[in-house]
């Protein structure tokens, strides 16, 4: 629990770099958009000034082993989600964000970065699509009707759309399998949306959900509308997202949700104090022993226990000493 968004980014960056140093070759998933702004800045700062900070800075103060070094190129990175469809070169696409801030900014190995490309027909399937290479050729009006999964196509265009949807359903299954075959995510970092969504797992998402092509609700559409040209354009789109079970598949995973400001206090309260319920996606993380909320003081206003009371419980050993991760 910290005072502001800048400190929140610093705290999260330190925990991430500690984990990376202890888990070379680990499997990770990090957020895109506005949520990780200061997290990214602090990670880049510490990577640039690692030796200095390890000898005389905060890395020394927190007792990090001086022999450790975060090997960013060893990590296997999985993109959390993406709009469907969207050009990967679009400056508001999450793929564009990953390439600019994580591959270029953090130095991840591009060969170990798993992207969600929702614009190009996968190369292995192109022979079945003739001259069609991109999804805007399949969905020229931009409308994604996932009902075509089970509906009988009315014409050749609908048949093509149905084939494309099923192709990306298989992509999602393969993506999920790839994560599981690596033992699941070792480190997950995410924000929490206005309806409590984690990645694009909106309220009502099953806690056993996996990577999938799906629709999103109005609250999530509205939050994305400014970046993507207005609500009418966003309402036409679907999304691909990892599932809630994808996040918790590895029982030893470190899962961190960051939330800043009083506007997130209701989502924090629901996630922390409600019993597991599909209405509150973040309650699915309660099964993880290393799940944590990193939050600002203003995001705690609805929590039943005050910070003072929590610290007293820690002092009395009624809560674990690492309840506050700093």
Predicted region positions:
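N-terminal glycine-/serine-/threonine-rich phosphate-binding loop
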Residues: 1-29, 38-69, 132, 137-138
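Glycine-rich beta-strand-to-loop/alpha-helix junction loops that act as flexible
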Residues: 30-35, 190-194, 260
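ATP/nucleoside-binding phosphotransfer catalytic cores, i.e., glycine-rich phosphate-binding loops
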Residues: 3, 7, 241-326
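Short, conserved loop/helix-junction motifs that constitute active-site signature segments
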Residues: 50, 67-74, 106-108, 247-252, ...
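Ligand-binding beta-strand-loop-alpha-helix segment within the catalytic cores
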Residues: 57-186, 313-325
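Catalytic cores of processing enzymes, dominated by hydrolases/peptidases
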Residues: 218-249, 258
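Gly/Ser/Thr-rich active-site loops/lids in small-molecule metabolic enzymes
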Residues: 200-233, 275-287
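Active-site histidine-anchored catalytic micro-motif
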Residues: 40-41, 45-90, 123, 161, ...
